[in-house]
């Protein structure tokens, strides 16, 4: 049978690492940049749909 040890597994370590403020700030920056990029792409799609000769 497998022994029970108190070392955290990979998932637990990842969750603890993501809980650190520095990593949360980095995740927020990445999420913000992705959302900004999606918004810009959306505007381009809307403009291209309304006026196909724009770009």
Curated annotation (Swiss-Prot):
GO terms for cellular component: plasma membrane. Keywords: Cell membrane, Hydrogen ion transport, Ion transport, Membrane, Transport. The keyword Membrane applies. It is a peripheral membrane protein. Its main location: membrane. Optimum pH is 5.2 for ATP hydrolysis. It is found in: Cell membrane. The keyword ATP-binding does not apply. GO terms for biological process: proton transmembrane transport. Component of the A-type ATP synthase that produces ATP from ADP in the presence of a proton gradient across the membrane. Has multiple subunits, A(3), B(3), C, D, E, F, G, I and K(x); there may be a few other subunits as well. This organism has both a Na(+)-translocating F1F0 ATP synthase and this H(+)-translocating A1A0 ATP synthase. This is A-type ATP synthase subunit G. It comes from Methanosarcina mazei (strain ATCC BAA-159 / DSM 3647 / Goe1 / Go1 / JCM 11833 / OCM 88) (Methanosarcina frisia).
């Amino acid at each position: 049978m497998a022994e029970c040890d108190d070392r955290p597994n990979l998932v637990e370590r990842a969750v603890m690492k993501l809980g650190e403020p520095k990593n949360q700030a980095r995740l927020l920056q990445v999420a913000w940049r992705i959302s900004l990029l999606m918004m810009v792409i959306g505007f381009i799609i809307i403009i291209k749909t309304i006026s196909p000769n724009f770009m």
